[in-house]
Amino acid sequence: MIPEQTNHVVSTIENLPAESISASPGPLHRMRNVFSREMLLSVALGQVLSLLICGIRLTSKYLSEDFHANTPLFQSFLNYILLFLVYTTTLAVRQGEENLLAILKRRWWKYMFLGIIDIEATYLVVKAHQYTTFISIQLLNCFVIPVVILLSWFFLLVRYKVLHFIGAIACILGIGCMAGADVLMGRQQKGDFYPGDSKLIGDVLVLGGATLYGISSVCQEYIVRNLSRVELLGMIGLFGSFFSGIQLAIMEHKELLKVPWDWQIGLLYVGFTACMFGLYSFMPVVIKKTSATAINLSMLTAELYTFFCGLFLFHYKFSGLYLLSFFTILLGLVFYFSTNTYVAQDPRVYKQFRNPSGPVVELPSSGQLEPSVTYTSLSQETEEEPRVRVA
């Protein structure tokens, strides 16, 4: 008996339906993938934070140079009081597990340390202006970038790609270009008056402040992703106002008595507090949308916005290097946001900010733990990233 033969139909490119043949993407399509709406939105949100920092620096400059009101602790204290009035009182009137007392019962000491870190980060950088040059502060402030990247890698389990590192390096090169422009245009006039030991102290203060900023940023990212923005700001307002008030009473009460109060100074304090409150309120939103690393890269443009305003307000000299610096930082941001980071979800990692009195999950004692890697997306791509299993 002859076995029945099966007919096999071979599909070639000629007999496939036209809609099943996808042409290779052209340059315009690739540009749209890179400059997606989500990527442009992420860059724009970071620039809003930079503009708020610009407002903070301009009002501080007017207060210190024109009115001789050197009160950085008092200015921060006003912001913490406003955070307390808005967000801490919101927590106080809530019911259940999100109530202020319930949060304090579970996590009070963690937020206490976060509040102290937030206060001292600002204080160290402001104090460094008395010991070292402005250009040194510009350059050493970039130390916050590797701090945030390392902390995000080890504690938030964020994994980066090559383009992320290229973007970060480009942003730091932009800051270096801006510092070079400051030297060429003579904006640094006090640098020769700082003795070596004094300058070393100032540089150490900047590095310490940048490190504390990095720790604070990573803690904020964890809290807004796992808890809530209102809880974060309410706790910072509570502990920040308490500890900054104590530090103000000890270290700055004499300076506060020397302030020549009038309506102009009052208006500058109001403007500073409004910008600072807006920065603190909006930053958790941007962190949740992007990441702690992304916002610290985005805020590198704040110094350039301050310079551009200074062209009209303080008659700074212009140089094309400032524009080159600005576009170099923006190019670095485009590189950084053009691809997605991903988060390794390891079951061996214990969530430290969770309620320690909650139920304990038993991990299997036998067998090899296989942490998975989950990709997070900042774009509207529909293509799914592969799931990776780590042996």
Swiss-Prot record:
This is Solute carrier family 35 member F2. Putative solute transporter. InterPro entries: SLC35_F1/F2/F6, SLC35F_Transporter. Keywords: Membrane, Transmembrane, Transmembrane helix, Transport. GO terms for molecular function: transmembrane transporter activity. It is a multi-pass membrane protein. It comes from the Eukaryota. It comes from Xenopus tropicalis. It is found in: Membrane. GO terms for cellular component: membrane. Belongs to the SLC35F solute transporter family.
